[in-house]
Amino acid sequence: MYDAVTRPSPPADASAWPRRITQAVKVGNVIVGGGHPVVVQSMTNTDTADIAGSVKQVAELWRAGSEMVRLTVNNAESAAAIPRIVEKLRMMGIEVPLIGDFHYNGHQLLTAEPACAEALAKYRINPGNVGFGKKKDLQFAQLIEFAIQYDKPVRIGANWGSLDQALAAQLMDENSKRETPWDAGRVLREALIRSAVDSAERAVELGLPRERIILSAKVSGVQELIAVYRDMAARCDFALHLGLTEAGIGSKGIVASAAALSVLLQEGIGDTIRISLTPEPGQSRTQEVIVAQELLQTTGQRAFTPLVTACPGCGRTTSEFFQELAGVVQNHVRAKMPEWKISNPGAENMTLAVMGCVVNGPGESRHANIGISLPGTGEAPSAPVFVDGEKTVTLRGENIAYEFIDLIDQYVERTYVRRAG
C-alpha cells in the first residue's frame, strides 16, 4: 500500500502548489503522471461501429489538441471496429492513443475480439458495473489479465451514478454503528474512493504494475469532486484523471468544470483531465478540448496557444472594433499554432493584448509581448502598439487589423527561432 505523505504547504509566491508525485503511466505515445504535463483527453459521441464517422470525429478532436481519445466499446460490432479505426487513423498520420470505455461486458468483448485488446492504448474499467455478486471479482480479474497480457494500462474509474452497491451498503451499515455517524454525502464519497483505490490494489495483487494504473472517482457536484480527489490523492500514488462526470451544457458546464478542476490543479492534484460538456445543438465536439486547454493555460499548467487578453468593454468603448479585432487575433493565432509549433517553438507562450481605451489600454499592452490600445469614445483615432513593454508604432486607418496581425507574425519569426541541432 502507498503511504500517504503530508499535504504540502501552499507556496508563498503566485505559483501553483508543487505537483503531486504519482506513478508515470505510458498510454501509447503519451505519458500520464510522474510529473509530466497534465494531459488533455476527450471522448467521441459517435457509434463506434460507424468506422468512418468515428475516424472523422477522432481526427477532429486530435486536430483540436486532444492527446488521448476515449470511445465506447459496448458490443461486438464496436469492438471489431477498433482495429480498423486505429489503422485508418494511422493512414492519415494520426497517432493518438485510443481508450476503450467498457461497462458490464468488457471481459466478453476482449475475449471475442483480441485484436481490439491489442489495438487499444488503454482500457477504462468501471468497478461499479464490471460484474455483480460472485461474478464481479472474476470478471474484473479477466480484464486485468488482458491488460497484463497486452501490456496495457487501465483507468479504474468509479462513478457516483454507477457506484458499487454492495460496497455502498457495507459502508452504510458500518456507518450506522459509529458513535457519531457520518452524513450520507461523506459515506458516498468514501464508497467512491474505496471502490477505486481498493480495485487498484486488487489489480496490483493480480500482477498489474502500479505504473499501469490511473484512477478516477467522478461526481457531478463541484464541492463533492474537490473533496473526493483531495482525499483520494492523500491515500495513494496512482495517477489521477480529473473531471466532473456530467458538467452540463454551455456556460454552466464550463464554469462548473473550471471551478472544480482549477482548485485541484492549483493544489497539484491531477494528471489528466476531461471536460465532460454536453454539446449544444450544432456545436462541435471539439469545444471540450478547447475548454480543457484554456483551463490548463489560464491556471499556468501548460501553454497551447498565445494568450489573448482583451478589454471587456464599457461606456468608454462604444465602438465594436476592439471586440472584432480581439476575435480576429484569437482565431489567427489558433490557426497558426500548428505551423508555429513546428517552425517557431515557444510561440505558444506569447501573450497578446487588445484593449479598447486609454484607461487600461497602454498599461495592459505593456504587460503583454505585443499589445494594442485602440481609441475609446472621443479619443484620437490612433492605436499605439507596444512590443515587450516599449511603444514601437502607432497604427491608423482602415488596415489596423491587418497591420497588427502582420506585427504579430513578424514578432513570432523574430523571437521564436528553432535552434539548429
Swiss-Prot record:
<comment type="similarity">
    <text>Belongs to the IspG family.</text>
</comment>
<dbReference type="GO" id="GO:0051539">
    <property type="term" value="F:4 iron, 4 sulfur cluster binding"/>
</dbReference>
<dbReference type="InterPro" id="IPR045854">
    <property type="entry name" value="NO2/SO3_Rdtase_4Fe4S_sf"/>
</dbReference>
<keyword id="KW-0411">Iron-sulfur</keyword>
<dbReference type="GO" id="GO:0016114">
    <property type="term" value="P:terpenoid biosynthetic process"/>
</dbReference>
<feature type="binding site">
    <location>
        <position position="364"/>
    </location>
    <ligand>
        <name>[4Fe-4S] cluster</name>
    </ligand>
</feature>
<dbReference type="GO" id="GO:0046429">
    <property type="term" value="F:4-hydroxy-3-methylbut-2-en-1-yl diphosphate synthase activity (ferredoxin)"/>
</dbReference>
<dbReference type="InterPro" id="IPR016425">
    <property type="entry name" value="IspG_bac"/>
</dbReference>
<dbReference type="GO" id="GO:0141197">
    <property type="term" value="F:4-hydroxy-3-methylbut-2-enyl-diphosphate synthase activity (flavodoxin)"/>
</dbReference>
<keyword id="KW-0414">Isoprene biosynthesis</keyword>
<feature type="binding site">
    <location>
        <position position="357"/>
    </location>
    <ligand>
        <name>[4Fe-4S] cluster</name>
    </ligand>
</feature>
<dbReference type="InterPro" id="IPR004588">
    <property type="entry name" value="IspG_bac-typ"/>
</dbReference>
<dbReference type="Pfam" id="PF04551">
    <property type="entry name" value="GcpE"/>
</dbReference>
<dbReference type="GO" id="GO:0005506">
    <property type="term" value="F:iron ion binding"/>
</dbReference>
<dbReference type="GO" id="GO:0019288">
    <property type="term" value="P:isopentenyl diphosphate biosynthetic process, methylerythritol 4-phosphate pathway"/>
</dbReference>
<keyword id="KW-0479">Metal-binding</keyword>
<feature type="binding site">
    <location>
        <position position="311"/>
    </location>
    <ligand>
        <name>[4Fe-4S] cluster</name>
    </ligand>
</feature>
<keyword id="KW-0004">4Fe-4S</keyword>
<protein>
    <recommendedName>
        <fullName>4-hydroxy-3-methylbut-2-en-1-yl diphosphate synthase (flavodoxin)</fullName>
        <ecNumber>1.17.7.3</ecNumber>
    </recommendedName>
</protein>
<keyword id="KW-0560">Oxidoreductase</keyword>
<comment type="function">
    <text>Converts 2C-methyl-D-erythritol 2,4-cyclodiphosphate (ME-2,4cPP) into 1-hydroxy-2-methyl-2-(E)-butenyl 4-diphosphate.</text>
</comment>
<dbReference type="InterPro" id="IPR011005">
    <property type="entry name" value="Dihydropteroate_synth-like_sf"/>
</dbReference>
<keyword id="KW-0408">Iron</keyword>
<feature type="binding site">
    <location>
        <position position="314"/>
    </location>
    <ligand>
        <name>[4Fe-4S] cluster</name>
    </ligand>
</feature>
<comment type="pathway">
    <text>Isoprenoid biosynthesis; isopentenyl diphosphate biosynthesis via DXP pathway; isopentenyl diphosphate from 1-deoxy-D-xylulose 5-phosphate: step 5/6.</text>
</comment>
